[in-house]
């Protein structure tokens, strides 16, 4: 039995009874959908009609495996990401062309890399990047809103904001009743400095899918609108709904900080760091906020200010050894390629001051570099880092080098040096 109720009046709009076999479940679904559309006199767009007519998979078992994997993804914890993967891989084994399952795997691998959770999945950053690329490539052969949402997230992580917004627009155009496009657009609008518009899109996503956990996105928009009481209430709900998701505590602490609720902020920071420790991450510092991708610096500073008021420390002190002096640093870098400890980043320092890089996501960028007095290496990419100039100091540690922010607040990374341009950057 199926019924459609008007929630504003409590009256029945439509009801019917159906009998079917399990292997006919998709045909039954199509029939129910068409009857609901008729009852509501809905005019579907051409794209929606096409998607209704075209099945994403003919395998009920693949669909069931996808749903089980997606349920774990929605909990957004390291353990649940690890649990999601076998189900999603099983969905693809049952139907190798199942685009939504490929998109879901691309999402899990990319976000695990983004959250520093790859160890929980048993892969390296390079492997996570490659799996993301491969599954997204498959997903975009027959795209779903989820595929465009994932592409949008990857582009925004590279500060390619216009392209990221275009992908979110494609997700919405493909299916106006799928929440993924609205969630992607809402997130982006907050990042580019339009939180009021972003809030509208996030609320739309929540109306379309009340079961998904969009509370972090809602609280994020409220926070950047400086509606800190609302943000704190939202994020408190989020921590109760999903106590294993550390970033819920992170944003709650920032909201408490802005509200001057010092004791609550302190205990929330402690819980946040406790959850980080479970996945092998050290205590968070204010310097780590530099890694948050915002187009507008004011949005990042608002977050940093809240966390500072919450008692988050500035950062770890630089090593008590001498940084490399200017001339030694210039000789070290000129005409050489630095490769990150993970092997995912490669940067070639051309002798003419040009800079060429490739990230673990496969994206590339160009920029300029220079050595200034005091032994500081300064670089400015075209896209990465929002095109902002950043300066660092360097330390030699055995066969490796460390580079730290110029103020000594935090190590940025470790790398090895190779002569020339072996990566053809």
Show the residue positions of the predicted features.
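Lipid interaction determinants
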Residues: 318-368, 372-425
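Terminal, low-structured helical/coil segments at or just beyond the last alpha-helical repeat
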Residues: 281-319
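Short amphipathic alpha-helical segments with coiled-coil-like heptad repeat character
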Residues: 77-79, 310-314, 374-381
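Non-catalytic carbohydrate-binding regions of carbohydrate-active enzymes
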Residues: 240-247, 274-280
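Acidic, proline/glycine-rich low-complexity intrinsically disordered segments
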Residues: 1-225, 230, 234-236, 245-249, ...
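TPR/TPR-like (Sel1-like) alpha-helical repeat modules
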Residues: 257-280
């Amino acid at each position: 039995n199926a019924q459609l109720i008007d929630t504003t009046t409590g009256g029945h709009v439509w009801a019917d009874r159906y009998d079917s076999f399990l292997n006919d479940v998709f045909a039954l679904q199509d029939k129910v959908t068409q009857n609901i559309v008729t009852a509501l006199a809905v005019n579907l767009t051409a794209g929606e009609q096409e998607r209704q007519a075209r099945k994403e998979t003919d395998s009920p078992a693949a669909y069931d495996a996808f749903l089980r994997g997606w349920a774990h993804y929605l909990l957004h914890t390291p353990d649940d990401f690890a649990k999601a993967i076998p189900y999603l891989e099983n969905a693809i084994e049952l139907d190798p062309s199942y685009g939504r399952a490929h998109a879901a795997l691309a999402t899990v691998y990319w976000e695990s890399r983004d959250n520093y959770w790859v160890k929980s999945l048993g892969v390296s950053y390079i492997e996570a990047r490659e799996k993301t690329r491969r599954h997204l490539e498959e997903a975009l052969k027959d795209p779903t809103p989820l595929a465009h949402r994932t592409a949008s997230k990857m582009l925004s992580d590279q500060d390619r904001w216009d392209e990221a917004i275009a992908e979110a627009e494609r997700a919405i155009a493909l299916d106006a009743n799928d929440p993924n496009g609205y969630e992607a657009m809402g997130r982006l609008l907050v990042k580019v400095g339009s939180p009021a518009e972003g809030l509208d899109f996030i609320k739309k996503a929540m109306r379309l899918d009340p079961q998904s956990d969009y509370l972090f996105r809602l609280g994020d928009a409220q926070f950047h609108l400086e509606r800190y009481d609302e943000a704190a209430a939202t994020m408190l709900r989020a921590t109760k709904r999903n106590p294993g998701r550390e970033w819920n505590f992170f944003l709650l602490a920032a909201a408490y900080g802005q509200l001057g609720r010092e004791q609550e902020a302190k205990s929330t920071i402690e819980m946040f760091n406790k959850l980080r420790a479970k996945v092998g991450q050290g205590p968070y510092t204010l310097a780590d906020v530099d890694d948050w991708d915002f187009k507008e610096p004011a949005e990042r500073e608002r977050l940093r200010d809240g966390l500072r008021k919450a008692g988050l420390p500035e950062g770890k002190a630089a090593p008590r050894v001498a940084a490399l002096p200017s001339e030694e640093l210039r000789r070290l870098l000129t005409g050489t390629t630095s490769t990150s400890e993970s092997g995912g980043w490669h940067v070639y320092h051309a002798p003419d001051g040009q800079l060429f890089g490739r990230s673990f996501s496969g994206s590339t960028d160009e920029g300029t570099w220079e050595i200034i007095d005091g032994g500081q290496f300064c670089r400015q990419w075209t896209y990465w880092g929002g095109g902002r100039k950043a300066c660092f100091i360097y330390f030699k540690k055995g066969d490796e080098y460390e580079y730290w922010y110029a103020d000594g607040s935090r190590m940025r990374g470790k790398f090895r040096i190779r002569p020339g341009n072996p990566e053809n950057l």
